[in-house]
Regions:
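N-terminal organellar transit peptides
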Residues: 1-102, 106-110, 118-257
C-alpha cells in the first residue's frame, strides 16, 4: 500500500475518533437511558457536522451499549436522509427494551417516521409539531435516469406510508395521510391526534429545530418556528466551523507525519 494511502486511512480513523467525542450517552441509569434526536439525520459520521446530528452507525453503537435498557427517546429534528432515517427506525423497532417517545418540538420529514418507532403512541405537546411531506431528492441525468429517480421516490413514499398506516387514528384512511404528505402538512399535537395515534402533551418551551435546509425546502413551515430557529442556526453554524477546524487541523497533523 502506498505511504500516502496509509496516511489518509490513519487520518480518517483519527478524525472519526475526534468526531465520536462529540457523541455521548445522557442520563443513563441502571434501568434506562435517554436518546436524543436534536439535529439532522445523516448517513454517516462524516456528515455529522453538528454534535446533535445522528446517523445509523451511532445509533447501532448506542443501542448495543444500552443493552436492553428502557429507552426515553426525545425528538426535535427537521429530518434529513430518508434511508438513514429508515435504518434508524428499523433498528429502534427491533430493540428489545421498552421505548417511550417524546416529540419535544418538531418531528419533521423522516424524523416523523422515527417518532413512530415505538409500538405505543408518542407524546406530542400541543405546541409541538409533526411535519409530513413527500420525499424529495436531487437528481441529474437524462430522461431515463430522471424517471428511475421518480420511481425510487414513489417506492420510498410507499415505505413511509406503511409506517404511518400502522399508527392511524381510528377511522382515518391512509389516502387522507397521503394527501397531507402531498401538501406538506404541519400538525401540532392536537391536530396530529386527529390523524395518528399520539398522546397530546402539555405545552413546553423547547424551540423547534427549524434548520436552514428546512426553511429552504419546506414551503409551509409556521412563521413562529422559522423566526425561533434563527439563533439556533447561528449557534449550529459556529459549532460547524469549530468542528471543521478541528478535523482539518487533525488531518494536517497526520499528513505531516
Amino acid at each position: 500500500m502506498p505511504r500516502i494511502e496509509k496516511k489518509f486511512i490513519a487520518c480518517k480513523d483519527a478524525a472519526h475518533a475526534t468526531v465520536g467525542k462529540f457523541y455521548e450517552f445522557k442520563n443513563a441509569t441502571e434501568t434506562s437511558v435517554d436518546l436524543y434526536f436534536y439535529g439532522d439525520i445523516v448517513s454517516d459520521w462524516w456528515g455529522a457536522w453538528q454534535e446533535e446530528d445522528q446517523y445509523p452507525e451511532a445509533i447501532k453503537n448506542f443501542l448495543a451499549e444500552a443493552n436492553g435498557k428502557d429507552l426515553n427517546i426525545y425528538i426535535n429534528s427537521g429530518g434529513g436522509s430518508v434511508f438513514a432515517g429508515i435504518a434508524i427506525y428499523n433498528m429502534l423497532k427491533r430493540y428489545p427494551g421498552k421505548k417511550t417517545v417524546h416529540v419535544d418540538a418538531l418531528a419533521g420529514s423522516i424524523a416523523s417516521v422515527i417518532a413512530f418507532a415505538d409500538s405505543e403512541a408518542p407524546t406530542i405537546p400541543s405546541n409541538a409539531y409533526l411535519m409530513i411531506h413527500k420525499p424529495w431528492a436531487g437528481c441529474e441525468g437524462n430522461a431515463i435516469e430522471m424517471r428511475k429517480m421518480a420511481d425510487t421516490l414513489d417506492a420510498v413514499e410507499a415505505g413511509i406510508l406503511s409506517v404511518y398506516e400502522e399508527h392511524l387514528a381510528e377511522g382515518v384512511d391512509i389516502k387522507t395521510v397521503k394527501k397531507l404528505m402531498e401538501e406538506e402538512t404541519w400538525l401540532d399535537g392536537t391536530k396530529a391526534a386527529e390523524y395518528f395515534q399520539v398522546k397530546v402533551g402539555e405545552e413546553n418551551t423547547v424551540a423547534a429545530a427549524v434548520q436552514d435546509f428546512t426553511k429552504m425546502y419546506c414551503r409551509n413551515a409556521p412563521k413562529d418556528l422559522v423566526g425561533a430557529g434563527t439563533a439556533d442556526n447561528e449557534r449550529l453554524r459556529q459549532q460547524d466551523q469549530e468542528k471543521r477546524k478541528s478535523i482539518i487541523a487533525l488531518t494536517m497533523a497526520h499528513m505531516s507525519q
